[in-house]
Structure formats: C-alpha cells, structure tokens
Design a protein with these regions (language model features):
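Membrane-anchoring hydrophobic segments
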Residues: 1-21
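Generic alpha-helical transmembrane segments
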Residues: 17-39
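Hydrophobic transmembrane alpha-helices
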Residues: 32-40, 51-100
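Regulatory cytosolic signal-relay segments
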Residues: 82-145
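Catalytic NTP-binding/metal-coordinating core of nucleotidyl cyclase/transferase enzymes
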Residues: 141-216
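Catalytic core of nucleotidyl cyclases, primarily class III adenylyl/guanylyl cyclases
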Residues: 187-213, 229-268
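Catalytic/regulatory signature loops of cyclic-dinucleotide turnover enzymes
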Residues: 247, 268-291
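Cytosolic regulatory/linker segments at or just downstream of nucleotide-handling modules
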Residues: 282-320
Length: 320
C-alpha cells in the first residue's frame, strides 16, 4: 500500500507504477509481517522500556527491514532479467538513490511505520476490543451476552510474595502476566481483568466453544510457562504454577465509570467460576471445567476428562 501511494503521488496512476508497487510491496509486506509475528522475544526483551523508547526502536527496526528488503528485491529483479527490470522499473536505481526521491520515500515509510506501530501498541496495552467498544458506545446501554470465562490463579502466591519481597514479587508477576498474554491472544481470548495474582480471560460463547479453544488456551499457557521455565528458575528461583476454572453462560455487560470508563461483566457465571476455582485445591485439580461447558464442546482426542462429581458451591443454592 505504501509503495502504491508513493507511486501514485509521484507519477500519477498508471499500470507501470501499479505493477512496480505490487512486485516490490507484496513480498516485502509478507516478510515484515512474518518478522513481526515472530518478534515475541524482541518484545519480551524490551517490555520494560518506556512506551516511546520502545515505539521508536521498533519503528526504526521495521523501516530498516523494509528498506533492506526493498533494495534486495530490486537488485534481484535486475540480476534475473535486465529487460524485465527496465520494463517494471522505468526509473534507474541511480536516479532513485541520487535524488530526493529516496528521502521522500524514507520519510513516508517512517511516518506510516510510526503511526501503525503506535496504534498497535495502543491496542496491545489497552485492549483492541475494549477500545472499539468504548469508542463506538457498544455497551453504553446495559446488554446481556453469552460468554465463557477462564479464571487463572497463581498457586502459593502469599508464600511467594513473603519469600521474594514486594518489589521482586511485582517483577515476578509482571513477567508471568506478560508471558501468558501471548497464548491467550493466540487462542482469541481477551484479558478482562488482572485481580492480584489472578487473570480473568473471556470469549464470546461460540468462539470459545468452537474447537474447544478456551480449554486448549489453558494448556497453551502451561506450555508457554514451561518454555520460559529456565528463565524463571534463574531469575526468581521458581517457576509459576497455576490453577484454572472454566465456565460460561449469560452475563450482563455494560460500560461503567465516568472518568475511567471500562467494560464490566456481572452475573452468576463469574461468581460460579470463582467458586469453582476455589475447589481446585480441594480436588487436587489444575483445571476444572463445568459440565455445562463440556456438554457444548467437542474435546480434542488427546485430552481426557474426569468427572469430579456434583458440588454445592459456597453461596450457591444450585449444585454444579
């Protein structure tokens, strides 16, 4: 798109400009998209930098990749077939490099990259759905929705906090919450709240039930923590261990707050899920899934479910 806009602004619309932009931009765009989706380690290393330092660094990184790949593709076209190059790129490389066109193009690339990275980081920090819903006023009026909720709670958090001290424990939670966010997003979950050492993840009901996405998300989170277990052992002397509960149903959702508005969920579903989470220790289970959820989704063949029985949860009249 950037190549097409530049070509149109510089030379007006013509098929040569369009073909130039497509031939150069499509492989460059795919390559940069691949690099960015594989940049988990880059984000992880620089996550404690200030927002603007990280933003500028990431933008510079993308622009460097962009220009390197662009030049590589142009040189490759020349090497493969000079006649083809002269047809597709009517302006010589020397003309492009030796005039202000290069600086114009770099300025456009830098501005577009900075703006897109700013939006991406804003979405990542504040929540993509939350921003759209607040701006569009989707929940300005109270509504009911069918949703799934996954409560993930860190085990032995009180003992860990006393052992590490408040400051070190806060760093520990930062790393833990950061690392589990990637698999949550990969499985289409949205973090609703961080409550102490607990994270609440939610899905629209059908999206979470399809292919048992919500259940598989839990195991993806486990895998992510195992991936960084050596880091946690070296940095903190322990690896996070957690339990979780999954339940779903009808909840009330609305926009609350005047000066710090947010989307809030209310209803029996959240209370029940929290009570289920409290049963994990008693039942020696890392994950409890309600029979209501099990009955509406098809579990992967590699997962085995055990019926834990029927329980009267605290504060609940109906058994689950």
């Amino acid at each position: 798109l950037l190549f097409a806009v530049y070509a149109f602004a510089r030379y007006g619309f013509n098929w040569i400009a369009l073909s130039t932009s497509l031939i150069a931009s499509v492989p460059v765009g795919f390559a940069i998209a691949f690099f960015e989706t594989q940049s988990q380690e880059f984000r992880r290393r620089h996550r404690r930098n200030s927002f603007w330092i990280y933003l500028v660094y990431r933008t510079f990184r993308v622009v460097v990749w962009f220009m390197m790949l662009f030049f590589f593709i142009m040189l490759l076209v020349i090497w493969l077939n000079v006649d083809t190059y002269e047809t597709i790129f009517p302006h010589s490389l020397y003309d492009f490099f030796a005039t202000r066109k290069l600086f114009e193009f770099l300025a456009i690339a830098l501005a577009v990259s900075l703006f897109s990275n700013f939006l991406d980081e804003l979405h990542r920090k504040l929540g993509r759905d939350a921003i759209y819903n607040l701006v569009l006023g989707k929940y300005h009026q109270v509504k009911q929705e069918e949703r799934l909720f996954l409560f993930i709670d860190l085990n032995d958090s009180t003992d860990i906090a006393e052992e590490m001290g408040e400051l070190e424990y806060s760093h520990f939670l930062q790393d833990y919450f950061y690392d589990i966010s990637e698999p949550i997003a990969r499985y289409f979950g949205r973090v609703y709240q961080y409550v102490g050492d607990e994270v609440v993840v939610t899905w629209p009901l059908q999206k979470g039930l399809r292919y048992a996405v919500a259940v598989r998300c839990y195991f993806a989170v486990q895998k992510q923590i195992r991936r960084y277990s050596a880091y946690y052992e070296k940095r903190y002397g322990r690896v996070p261990v957690f339990k979780a509960a999954l339940h779903g149903g009808t909840v009330v959702v609305s926009e609350v707050g005047k000066y710090k508005s947010e989307i809030a969920y209310h209803g029996d579903v959240l209370n029940t899920t929290a009570r289920m989470l409290g049963k994990c220790h008693e039942l020696a289970s890392d994950l409890l899934v309600s029979n209501w959820v099990i009955g509406q989704t098809t579990m992967p063949a590699y997962l085995k479910t055990d019926d834990m029985g029927v329980f009267q949860l605290k504060g609940k009249q109906q058994e689950i």
